[in-house]
């Protein structure tokens, strides 16, 4: 098993390699393209390195650029309607307007990349179309969009390079796509550092400051007085908050609940899920302890698919799909939530260690991976109703949640860790 520390060390080596003018390999997520790209700083390119890139990849040489670079260099989108599954932001392709022949040779493409990496280049420095494919990186990098374009741009920034990286997809001798073991063998043969997009995401959540504190105030609730601290994501502008009970600074073993926004459950009292009940019980528990934190993550409706799509999933569930099948039917991941914002908020609150209130193993292990020191897990009762029993069982059986309740035909008095409700 590759540890978080090993992943961070690999990213640190990759950053050094980029600064030194060496290739690195970035492997994509299995749920996306599931391939590896050779990446090099545009300003470090040479005809020899370009020839190596062309010899071991598809030969489609991409160059990451910022939105501002695309504007200044007059690089419009390749098409008006982007139908690519991953919304890869191709601009028109380019060649250097001088100093080349046909534009396709290693030397010619090197010249084009050198101009893309030159801050003095202007629109007239290029002709269109050409043999190098600029891709516009999303602001926020891999935290915003976990693609090779953003990975390339993040590596350039972290290495102190001009914001233009070149990359192409690795292929085997028969031009089939390299997969993980083939990529690792190739990297070992040539001495290249390999990282994953997720390694880079973890690195950025660990070392970059990606949330900012906005405001704080006292807030009286039915469970007593809390303090609310509002944070804003600098990636997408979403505002999240932490409800804090007691003086938690530098405290050990602080009860913490990381709660994803669920308007239907938290506000409307929907019985399709147990979200509202979990939030209510967490507030009550923390109030009784006199110490604790609830981090409330907004923008995570429907396990990260959005409010409108969650309601679509509800309609599919009424047709017989379970909560996992409904997401997949809508072409969404089973669980698209990420917890980097929560980790940064908890670090800003200066907790030393926490006891996490959760049944969700993904949340538990991801927060650990992001540097949160979790001592143990607090188990609160599961609220079961006729409306949410199948939902809860699906979370247990298909998503691996740590829920402990008996089969449907057992009598109610046999439930030990479950509370039943007549709701709905």
Curated annotation (Swiss-Prot):
Listed SUPFAM superfamilies: RibA-like, YrdC/RibB
Cofactor binding: number and manner: Binds 2 divalent metal cations per subunit. Magnesium or manganese. Binds 1 zinc ion per subunit.
Domain of life: Bacteria
Binding site for Mg(2+) 1: 33
Region (GTP cyclohydrolase II): 207-424
Annotated InterPro entries: DHBP_synth_RibB-like_a/b_dom, DHBP_synthase_RibB, GTP_cyclohydro_II, RibA, RibA-like_sf, Riboflavin_synth_RibBA
Pfam families, alphabetized: DHBP_synthase (PF00926), GTP_cyclohydro2 (PF00925)
Residues the entry annotates as binding GTP: 257-261, 278, 301-303, 323, 358, 363
Enzyme Commission no: 4.1.99.12, 3.5.4.25
Cofactors (names): Mg(2+); Mn(2+); Zn(2+)
Catalyzed reactions per annotation: D-ribulose 5-phosphate = (2S)-2-hydroxy-3-oxobutyl phosphate + formate + H(+); GTP + 4 H2O = 2,5-diamino-6-hydroxy-4-(5-phosphoribosylamino)-pyrimidine + formate + 2 phosphate + 3 H(+)
Record key words, sorted: GTP-binding, Hydrolase, Lyase, Magnesium, Manganese, Metal-binding, Multifunctional enzyme, Nucleotide-binding, Riboflavin biosynthesis, Zinc
GO MF term set: 3,4-dihydroxy-2-butanone-4-phosphate synthase activity; GTP binding; GTP cyclohydrolase II activity; magnesium ion binding; manganese ion binding; zinc ion binding
Active-site residues per Swiss-Prot or TrEMBL entry: 335, 337
Residues given in the record as D-ribulose 5-phosphate binding sites: 32-33, 37, 145-149, 169
Pathway listed: Cofactor biosynthesis; riboflavin biosynthesis; 2-hydroxy-3-oxobutyl phosphate from D-ribulose 5-phosphate: step 1/1; Cofactor biosynthesis; riboflavin biosynthesis; 5-amino-6-(D-ribitylamino)uracil from GTP: step 1/4
Protein name per the record: Riboflavin biosynthesis protein RibBA
Organism: Chlamydia muridarum (strain MoPn / Nigg)
């Amino acid at each position: 098993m590759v540890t978080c520390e090993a992943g961070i060390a690999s990213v640190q080596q990759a950053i050094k390699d980029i600064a030194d003018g060496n290739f690195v390999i970035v492997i994509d997520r299995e749920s996306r393209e599931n391939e590896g790209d050779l990446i090099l700083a545009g300003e470090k390119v040479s005809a020899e390195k370009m020839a190596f890139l062309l010899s071991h990849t598809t030969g489609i040489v991409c160059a990451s650029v910022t939105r501002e670079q695309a504007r200044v260099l007059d690089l419009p989108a390749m098409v008006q309607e982007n139908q690519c599954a991953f919304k890869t932001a191709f601009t028109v392709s380019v060649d250097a307007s001088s100093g080349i022949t046909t534009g396709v040779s290693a030397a010619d493409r090197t010249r084009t990349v050198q101009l893309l990496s030159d801050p003095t280049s202007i629109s007239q420095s290029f002709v269109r179309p050409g043999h190098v494919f600029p891709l516009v990186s999303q602001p926020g990098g891999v935290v915003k969009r976990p693609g090779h374009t953003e990975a390339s741009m993040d590596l350039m920034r972290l290495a102190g390079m001009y914001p233009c990286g070149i990359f192409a997809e690795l292929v085997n001798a028969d031009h089939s796509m390299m997969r993980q073991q083939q990529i690792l063998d190739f990297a070992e043969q040539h001495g290249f550092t390999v990282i994953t997009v997720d390694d880079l995401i973890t690195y950025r959540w660990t070392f970059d400051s990606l949330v900012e504190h906005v405001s704080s105030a006292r807030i009286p609730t039915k469970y007593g007085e809390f303090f609310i601290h509002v944070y804003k994501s600098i990636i997408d502008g979403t505002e999240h908050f932490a409800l804090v009970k007691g003086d938690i600074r530098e405290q050990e073993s602080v009860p913490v609940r990381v709660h994803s926004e669920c308007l239907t459950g938290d506000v409307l009292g929907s019985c399709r899920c147990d979200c509202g009940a979990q939030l209510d019980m967490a507030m009550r528990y923390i109030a009784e302890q006199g110490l604790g934190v609830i981090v409330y993550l907004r923008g995570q409706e429907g396990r990260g698919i959005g409010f409108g799509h969650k309601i679509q999933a509800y309609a599919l569930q009424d047709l017989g799909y379970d909560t996992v099948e409904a997401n997949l039917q809508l072409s969404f991941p089973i669980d698209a939530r990420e917890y980097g914002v929560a980790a940064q908020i908890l670090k800003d609150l200066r907790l030393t260690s926490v006891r996490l209130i959760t049944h969700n193993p993904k949340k538990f292990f991801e927060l650990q991976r992001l540097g949160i020191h979790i001592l143990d897990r607090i188990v609160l009762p599961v609220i079961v109703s006729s409306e949410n029993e199948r939902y809860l069982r699906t979370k247990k059986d298909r998503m691996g949640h740590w829920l402990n309740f008996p089969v449907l035909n057992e009598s109610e008095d046999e439930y030990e860790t479950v509370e039943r409700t007549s709701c709905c």
